[in-house]
Amino acid sequence: MVLSLQTLTKKVLARQYPAQCHHHFLKCCGLWWHDGPIVYHQNQKKIWSSFFTDGVNINAALVKAVKENNYDLIVLFTEWGANIDYSLLSVNTECTRDLCRELGAKEQLKQQEVLHFFNMVKRDLTGSNIILCHEVFSHNPILETINRTKLRGIIYEQLEALMENTDILSELLTKYWYGMAVEFNLTKAIHYFYQRYAHLHQWRLMCALFYNNVFDLHELYTKEKVRMDMDEMLKWACRKNYNYLTIYYCCIVLGADLNKAMFHSIQFYNLGNIFFCIDLGADAFEEGKTVAYQNDKSFIASILSLNCYSKNDSLSLKETDPEVIKRMLKDYHSKNMSMAHKYYIKYGFDNID
């Protein structure tokens, strides 16, 4: 049955994917993007296309359409409620600028408007959206006009200990988006960055270790053959607490020293990691106490003085598949931490030698 234009439009607006036989009509009606139909969810204010397979905010879709100089979609998205002022973030030709003016765009965005869009769009954690964020922001001269301190504060909060001092904003932003892709295992975005930024292969490895992404760590080691000094890898894995997956992979799969992992965790004061290493078999308690005292962490030294710890035999030391490792550690709780906690509640640690 041939549907009317009105019915087709309603299907698009109601987020119903039209049948293959209707694609020609959708192309003729301008409801076509990235070699596929456009779907719009009116309540969520999100657009779906063959590129934005997980959906994207309509304002972000507008910015993408402006960047591509797609006049029909600029008009369409504006009619659907997109804020035409955000076109200023990606406009790159005078003809497109004139069209946006006709649609009501102002001459310049205020600083708070740019930061608002930045904060809004980065919360949409999909691979296609992170790629869009990189395309729009990483080399955008409009960011030179806003407060660098505020923008860097947003970036530092996300990257934490991964942050490096650099005055080159474009490089900082590229690492920021790449790091987010690895943290949330957005494989589409990860592969996008990997193919374009060969000099950031080690950055991807650092992010995989720091953000506990054992799947990406496994791919980097088995497929991409990206390498780093093993002690450096342990430092990145142990820098963040509860990084059980990447610590397990480094020590059990790749053969890193469990006691060194415990020492690094002591330096970073990450108790969860310390007890995980003990559960896996770390036993250099005297050396660990020395590291603790050297780093002014006497509480950890007291914890390590308890003579009650042993390897947790329920943890398999033979797994190499990331999926199996994740499943094994999903509900993991440290038996040695439980014993230390019970001792502390009953006796405290003040009188331990």
Curated annotation (Swiss-Prot):
Pfam families: ASFV_360 (PF01671). GO terms for biological process: symbiont-mediated suppression of host innate immune response; symbiont-mediated suppression of host JAK-STAT cascade via inhibition of STAT1 activity; symbiont-mediated suppression of host JAK-STAT cascade via inhibition of STAT2 activity; symbiont-mediated suppression of host type I interferon-mediated signaling pathway; taxis. Keywords: Early protein, Host cytoplasm, Host-virus interaction, Inhibition of host innate immune response by virus, Inhibition of host interferon signaling pathway by virus, Inhibition of host STAT1 by virus, Inhibition of host STAT2 by virus, Interferon antiviral system evasion, Viral immunoevasion. Its main location: host cell. It is found in: Host cytoplasm. One of its GO terms (cellular component) is host cell cytoplasm. Induction: Expressed in the early phase of the viral replicative cycle. The keyword Zinc does not apply. Transmembrane segments: none annotated. It comes from the Viruses. InterPro entries: ASFV_MGF360. Belongs to the asfivirus MGF 360 family. Interacts with host STAT1; this interaction mediates STAT1 degradation through apoptosis. Interacts with host STAT2; this interaction mediates STAT2 degradation through the proteasome. Plays a role in virus cell tropism, and may be required for efficient virus replication in macrophages. In addition, inhibits IFN-beta-induced IFN-stimulated genes (ISGs) transcription. Mechanistically, degrades host STAT1 and STAT2 through apoptosis and ubiquitin-proteasome pathways respectively. This is Protein MGF 360-9L. It comes from African swine fever virus (isolate Tick/Malawi/Lil 20-1/1983) (ASFV).
